[in-house]
């Protein structure tokens, strides 16, 4: 009898061991590409001790752009400057450009257009909250000069994008006050029409704007009572996608996790769990949401970038999102960001990497 029980017990233990082994196989650790785990690295701050580098000019770091091999150019909204940083370590570059009017958006000019009034095509272009477009090339020394003035129409520019289209070079400025996208040709002439979404509720205006491939993505935030600044809050936001001619192609996202969205970037194949997804950064809560484009052209929310502890990454005052290009602007798989922490009274430039 005892031997019979012992045999049954052995068989039961064997079955249990096999089941546990199968379970362990089923719950094998996620690969690096599957894990929602990202690391934030502060590179430059205006405050000592916050990042590896300290630069007092970096206050309310907003727009972020670079040429194919250039360092990053940052719009310092709080100091009316543009400062330059190397992507690999945030090393501060010697050139500092004066950009008056509270610069917000910034773009590198890859086109043959946008010649400055003083001669030569612009290399970098900025828009500002004073409703003016300013541009710079090496002949200007350390000052970006006014190339288009829309202050007479009370424009308040919050973002800037650029494209080289079949109709010629185009510059797109998000006029938050007048709730429109101003489009300029390669001579800084106004191109009327386009960038209209009649389904948007009143009180929302273009906030951030970014050319990705052959499309232009626009974020919308709620206007305050004076239509000068955004209103933060959970679900307060929209994202649309347009052709470079300004034709509405569709709605990317609305409400949900959006909170005064501004930054936009398309993740490369090396960016972990959200590789290939559209990343949308919230100024309102500092979180970054990922959206997958489906075969039918619609977008599906996939989640928020998280740190290794499983918490959503939140960067106070988050503005721009841009990936490196493997030159002085850092590795192609690294996401760089700007921010204006503490109610835009300070500045931060940093990076985000998978893992």
Which residue stretches match the model-derived regions?
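Bacterial N-terminal signal peptides that target proteins for export
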Residues: 2-16
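A general, composition-driven signal for non-globular sequence regions
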Residues: 2-5, 23, 36
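Bacterial N-terminal signal peptides
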Residues: 13-26
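Sequence/structural signature of beta-propeller domains
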Residues: 30-355
């Amino acid at each position: 009898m005892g031997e019979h029980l012992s045999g049954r017990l052995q068989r039961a233990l064997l079955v249990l061991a096999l089941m546990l082994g199968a379970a362990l196989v089923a719950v094998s650790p996620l690969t690096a590409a599957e894990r929602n785990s990202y690391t934030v690295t502060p590179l430059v701050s205006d405050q000592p001790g916050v990042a590896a580098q300290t630069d007092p000019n970096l206050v309310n770091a907003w727009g972020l752009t670079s040429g194919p091999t250039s360092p990053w150019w940052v719009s310092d909204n709080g100091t009316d400057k543009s400062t330059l940083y190397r992507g690999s370590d945030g090393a501060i570059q010697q050139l500092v450009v004066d950009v008056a009017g509270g610069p917000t958006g910034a773009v590198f000019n890859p086109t043959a257009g946008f010649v400055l009034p003083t001669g030569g095509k612009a290399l970098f272009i900025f828009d500002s909250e004073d409703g003016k477009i300013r541009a710079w090339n090496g002949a200007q020394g350390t000052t970006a000069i006014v190339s288009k003035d829309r202050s007479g129409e009370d424009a308040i520019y919050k973002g800037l994008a650029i494209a080289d289209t079949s109709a010629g070079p185009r510059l797109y400025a998000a006029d938050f006050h007048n709730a429109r996208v101003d489009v300029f040709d390669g001579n800084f002439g106004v191109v009327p029409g386009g960038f209209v979404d009649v389904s948007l509720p009143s009180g929302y205006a273009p906030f951030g704007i970014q050319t990705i491939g052959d499309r232009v993505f626009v974020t919308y935030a709620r206007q305050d009572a004076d239509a000068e600044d955004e209103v933060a809050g959970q679900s307060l936001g929209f994202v649309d996608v347009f052709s470079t001619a300004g034709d509405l192609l569709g709605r990317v996202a609305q409400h949900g996790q959006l909170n005064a969205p501004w930054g936009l970037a398309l993740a490369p194949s090396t960016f972990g769990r959200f590789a290939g997804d559209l990343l949308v950064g919230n100024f309102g809560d500092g979180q970054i949401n990922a959206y997958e484009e489906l075969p039918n052209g619609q977008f599906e929310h996939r989640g928020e970038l998280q740190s290794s502890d499983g918490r959503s990454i939140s960067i106070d005052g988050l503005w721009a999102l841009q990936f490196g290009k493997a030159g002085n602007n850092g590795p192609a798989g690294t996401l760089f960001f700007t921010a204006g922490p503490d109610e835009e009274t300070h500045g931060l430039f940093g990076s985000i990497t998978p893992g």
